[in-house]
Curated annotation (Swiss-Prot):
Residue runs in coiled coils: none
Annotated protein name in UniProt: Protein NRT1/ PTR FAMILY 5.11
CDD domains: MFS_NPF5
Keyword annotations from UniProtKB, A to Z: Membrane, Phosphoprotein, Transmembrane, Transmembrane helix, Transport
Domain of life assignment: Eukaryota
TM region positions: 44-64, 74-94, 100-120, 134-154, 175-194, 204-224, 308-328, 342-362, 389-409, 424-444, 463-483, 507-527
Modification type Phosphothreonine: residues: T99
Subcellular location: Membrane
GO MF annotations, alphabetized: dipeptide transmembrane transporter activity; low-affinity nitrate transmembrane transporter activity; tripeptide transmembrane transporter activity
Tissue distribution: Expressed in shoots and roots.
């Protein structure tokens, strides 16, 4: 699918200048397993809030379905975009270790305030409702700020426990991303079963308080493993990576009128090296920076530019991805959720099937499919990251088509006024396919943005991965607002009417399926021409 760039050292590898390599006493699976447990505790906390957020907004806070969905998407988008700032601070100034500690502290404070806000008596007066909403949204966005530093750094910190220059550890690193996803999904599955039940049947304050304790445990466990990690808090004699890359663009712009011959004469050796690499055949305008910049710096700039088409074409997938915690949940709430007399399945619990399918499929993928594919492809990960991402995007389109068909059937049953509503179990296949899709695309995007950026920018690389989901959530929120306004005119019911039996979520799902197909076609075109930055990139 893509050409491989064979010179790993010029862009840097896991053994970067500010990692402390003590291979016999630190790092490896010993440290990586602890990082997985640390993030499992954090994921329990985050999804203990996020999974049922729309039900809290439409319930105790009294928002409409469309407003609540827009608020959830806006917050989720902010959670996904703030890592760009957190990654920048980590890679440029603080380092990943310090950033994780500081952001975890903010995270814990936000969760504590969130739980406190639910204890404020509501509906007693306008002032008390306003106070509750103010504290609630302030704490919610404080959690987002904590996530902004935590999320890009913890995954990179875990992957950095493996040396990419060692063949065995490079394979272990690829496996690490699979098992990190596995652990996260077990944790998310647990919190969706436990927290959502507590929130809807016992107490919202208790349901939001338990995630606070879980995040406190996450920070404690992370600090417990300090002596076993491969890391250093100091940068060793390297310029700010953002300054290096910015300088390449500035020099290329300054020299844009210089003839090629003058550039070659100015630095003949660097120019010959540039021409020797397949990756340098792309973005040749940056070669004009060779007058005053080093080859490695120019290649770093090109590596960053190559990410942009993949980032853009992956956004449609994340728009589709944004529907499972919002409209899928509201869709399930209108269906027959009884499993025994007096016992209802919380609608948000259905999201557990996404995680359950990942938990079931990842061991099969990592232990059976990868070795089988490796025997044919000779790729240490079985298939390339772009092939993995593309498989997941295709499956997400299939899930959305299935969701549209099920919603059409549900609406027909509701409008026929059947005495027994359609069973909620009809939604399970779309959740399962979404889970398998996430296993391919989410892990693939993590590996891709970790491996294809310069080593000193890996926190930012992971943040770029997360920002795709932010863009998807913001665009989803924008689409919902526009479609709601358009379809609510002239006395017509909105596609997102509060009474979903009179709404048309099926039309929205079909629209997303069409957009997904168009985005997938563009993705295939860019992926086919992509040039990998390293030979050992997953």
């Amino acid at each position: 699918m893509a050409i491989t760039y064979s010179s790993a050292d010029e862009l840097g590898n896991t053994t970067e200048g500010f990692l402390e390599i003590r291979e016999n006493t630190s790092g490896g699976w010993k440290s990586a397993r602890l990082i997985i447990v640390v993030q499992m505790a954090e994921r329990f906390a985050y999804f203990g809030i996020a999974s049922n957020l729309i039900m809290y907004l439409t319930g105790p806070l009294g928002e409409s379905t469309a407003a609540a969905a827009a608020n959830v998407n806006a917050w989720t988008g902010t959670v996904a975009f703030l890592p760009l700032l957190g990654g920048f601070l980590a890679d440029s100034y603080l380092g990943r270790f310090r950033t994780i500690i500081i952001s975890s502290s903010l995270y814990i404070l936000g969760l504590g305030l969130l739980s406190f806000s639910t204890m404020i008596p509501s509906h007693q007066s306008k002032d008390s409702n306003q106070l509750q909403e103010t504290i609630f949204f302030f704490s919610l966005y404080l959690v987002a700020i904590g996530q902004g530093g935590y999320n890009p750094c913890i995954k990179v910190f875990g992957a950095d426990q493996f040396d990419g220059n060692d063949h065995k550890e490079a394979r272990d690193k690829s496996s690490f991303f699979n098992w990190l996803m596995f652990g996260n999904c077990i944790s998310i599955l647990t919190t969706r079963l436990v927290s959502t039940y507590i929130q809807e049947n016992l107490s919202w304050s208790l349901g939001f308080g338990i995630p606070s304790v879980s995040m406190l445990l996450s920070l404690f466990l992370f600090l417990l493993g300090t002596t076993s990690y491969r890391f250093s808090t100091e940068r060793v004699g390297k310029k700010n990576p953002f300054a290096r890359i910015s300088r390449v663009f500035m020099e290329a712009l300054k020299n844009r009128r210089q003839p090629d011959l003058d550039i070659a004469n100015a630095n003949a050796n660097e120019t010959l090296l540039l021409l020797a690499h397949q990756s340098s055949k792309q973005f040749r305008f940056l070669d004009r920076a060779a007058i005053s910049c080093e080859l490695a710096e120019i290649e770093e700039a090109k590596a960053v530019l190559r990410l942009i088409p993949i980032w853009i074409t992956s956004v449609v997938y994340t728009i589709v991805h944004a529907q499972s915690p919002t409209f899928f949940t509201k869709q399930g709430a209108t269906m027959d959720r009884s499993i025994s007399p007096g016992l209802l399945v919380p609608a948000a619990t259905l999201q557990s099937f996404i995680n359950l399918s990942v938990v079931v499929f990842i061991p099969i993928y990592d232990r059976l499919l990868v070795p089988f594919a490796r025997s044919f492809t000779q790729n240490s990960s079985g298939i390339t990251t772009l092939q993995r991402i593309g498989t997941g995007i295709f499956l997400s389109i299939l899930a959305m088509v299935l969701a549209a068909l099920v919603e059409t059937k549900r609406l027909q049953a509701a409008r026929d006024e059947l005495s027994i509503p359609m069973s909620v179990w009809w939604l399970i296949p779309q959740y399962v396919i979404f889970g398998v899709s996430d296993m391919f695309t989410m892990v693939g995007l993590q590996e891709f943005f970790y491996g294809q950026v310069p080593s000193e920018l890996r926190s930012v690389g992971m943040a770029l991965n997360l920002s795709i989901y932010g863009a998807g959530n913001y665009l989803s929120s924008f689409m919902i607002s526009v479609i709601d306004k358009i379809t609510n005119q002239y006395g017509q019911r909105s596609w997102f009417d509060n009474d979903l039996d009179q709404a048309h979520l099926d039309y929205f799902y079909w629209l997303l399926a069409c957009l997904g197909f168009i985005g997938f076609a563009f993705y295939l075109w860019f992926a086919k021409s992509y040039v990998y930055s390293r030979s050992n990139t997953f």
